[in-house]
């Protein structure tokens, strides 16, 4: 052991002795340069992540494409074999191009199996919907045949739905046109609101898909409202994952007659900068009242993994005013529940705030699972509901029990008791006959 330690000390001393002349030589060379009047150029730190990626040659691109095609064929063969074996994998006809693009990004086989199972569930739901649709079509044909037969047998006028009636049938296309017309009117007179779609690079595939679904729900919730916003989707890139998913949800959004505002430009180029207010949960200033002259901006981002204050940084970089919803002032959050809200919940909150100006009404769109229930809520309603559910299962009537309990509670709290023992008039207290039963005997004899 001592021999190894001595060898280690000797080796370290030799290394130090070899390194010392190098440092001295570097010092002497720098001193000579200073005497000569020439300075050494300072080394600049280069961040490799800030440099653009080197351009690939055509041969490299073709090789990568060939490797990708080979890997895609292998994955398709894997999915086909698993489907033939009866596993939870959809058929190859169900797969779309964006499905295979996502499969190529999955690193492990277990991740591919989970994704295949998810697609298999979607395929089964679609097949079930098609079967139900076919059954409904057969039922409709049967009803039409019965109606025609009834008309042939009865020559008199038949009144009712499907027959002679004062009411006109309102088709789904009519409701659709009416709601689109309401959005067109909102583009002319309603306040504006912006959804910032510039966070695609900060989301993974799943988050981008969730963001696209929430953007679709924002459009639907805004269109169904009586007083909708003039909604603008800014910083949109049609080749991004979020916009491609949104196009699958709304296939007609690029039609010229469709009432949606898509802008590839930033909102600072479209609206006055002094009217813009960025709604971000990371700032310290609460939004007290709704101002119809302001244009509120919501960042279209789903941050399940990334919790960085990106919207705050962007608002500061653009020099915009910032505000956050007064959630802590009006709500008591439960333990372990995050304060994040979806995009459609934000739109619903702002719609109700614009209509009523009341935060209590607007914040009803916050999920109840995230907040603590109010203590002043009467517990009797919960007990009545739970006990009533149990009684209905047992086929019992318990309304009289709750009515008696309610009468007793009101009597003891607000008025004189109705069903409580009261002191009788004309009776004197006698200690010798108290609690002996003699007083009752005297009353009976009298």
UniProtKB/Swiss-Prot annotation:
It is found in: Mitochondrion. One of its GO terms (molecular function) is tRNA (adenine(9)-N1)-methyltransferase activity. The modification Phosphoserine is found at residues 50, 57, 62. CDD domains: Trm10_MRRP1. InterPro entries: MT_TRM10-typ (IPR028564), MT_TRM10-typ_sf (IPR038459), Trm10_C_MTase_dom (IPR025812), tRNA_m1G_MeTrfase_euk (IPR007356), tRNA_MeTrfase_TRMD/TRM10 (IPR016009). Pfam families: tRNA_m1G_MT. Component of mitochondrial ribonuclease P, a complex composed of rswl/MRPP1, scu/MRPP2 and mldr/MRPP3. Belongs to the class IV-like SAM-binding methyltransferase superfamily. TRM10 family. This is Mitochondrial ribonuclease P protein 1 homolog. The gene is rswl.
């Amino acid at each position: 052991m001592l021999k190894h330690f001595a060898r280690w000390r000797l080796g370290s001393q030799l290394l130090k002795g070899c390194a010392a002349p190098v440092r001295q030589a570097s010092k002497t060379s720098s001193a000579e340069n200073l005497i000569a009047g020439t300075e050494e150029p300072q080394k600049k730190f280069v961040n490799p992540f800030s440099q653009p990626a080197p351009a690939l040659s055509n041969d490299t691109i073709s090789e990568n494409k060939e490797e990708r095609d080979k890997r895609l064929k292998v994955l398709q063969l894997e999915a086909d074999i698993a489907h033939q074996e009866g596993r939870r994998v959809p058929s190859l006809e169900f797969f779309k191009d964006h499905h295979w693009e996502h499969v190529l990004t999955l690193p492990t086989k277990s991740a591919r199996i989970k994704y295949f199972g998810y697609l298999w569930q979607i395929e089964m739901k679609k097949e079930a919907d098609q079967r139900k649709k076919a059954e409904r079509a057969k039922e409709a044909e049967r009803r039409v045949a019965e109606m025609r037969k009834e008309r042939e047998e009865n020559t008199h006028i038949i009144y009712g739905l499907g027959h002679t009636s004062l009411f006109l049938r309102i088709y789904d296309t009519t409701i659709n046109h009416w709601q689109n017309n309401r959005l067109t009117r909102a583009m002319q007179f309603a306040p504006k609101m912006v959804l910032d779609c510039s966070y695609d690079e900060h989301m993974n595939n799943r988050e981008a898909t969730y963001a696209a679904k929430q953007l679709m729900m924002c459009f639907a919730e805004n269109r169904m409202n009586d007083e909708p916003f003039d909604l603008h989707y800014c910083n949109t890139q049609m080749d991004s994952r979020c916009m491609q998913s949104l196009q699958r949800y709304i296939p007609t959004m690029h039609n010229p007659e469709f009432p949606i505002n898509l802008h590839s430009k930033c909102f600072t180029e479209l609206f006055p900068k002094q009217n813009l207010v960025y709604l971000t949960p990371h700032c310290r200033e609460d939004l007290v009242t709704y101002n119809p002259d302001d244009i509120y901006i919501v960042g279209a981002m789903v941050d399940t993994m990334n919790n960085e204050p990106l919207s705050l940084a962007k608002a500061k970089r653009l020099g915009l005013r910032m505000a956050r919803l007064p959630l802590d002032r009006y709500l008591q959050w439960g333990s372990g529940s995050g304060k994040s809200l979806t995009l459609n919940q934000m739109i619903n909150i702002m719609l109700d705030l614009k209509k009523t100006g009341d935060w209590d009404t607007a914040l009803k769109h916050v999920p109840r699972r995230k907040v603590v229930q109010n203590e002043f809520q009467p517990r009797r309603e919960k007990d009545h509901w739970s006990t009533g559910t149990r009684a209905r299962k047992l086929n019992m009537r318990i309304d009289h029990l709750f009515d008696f309990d309610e009468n007793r509670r009101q009597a003891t709290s607000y008025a004189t008791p109705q069903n409580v023992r009261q002191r009788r008039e004309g009776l004197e207290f006698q200690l010798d006959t108290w609690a002996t039963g003699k007083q009752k005997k005297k009353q009976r004899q009298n």
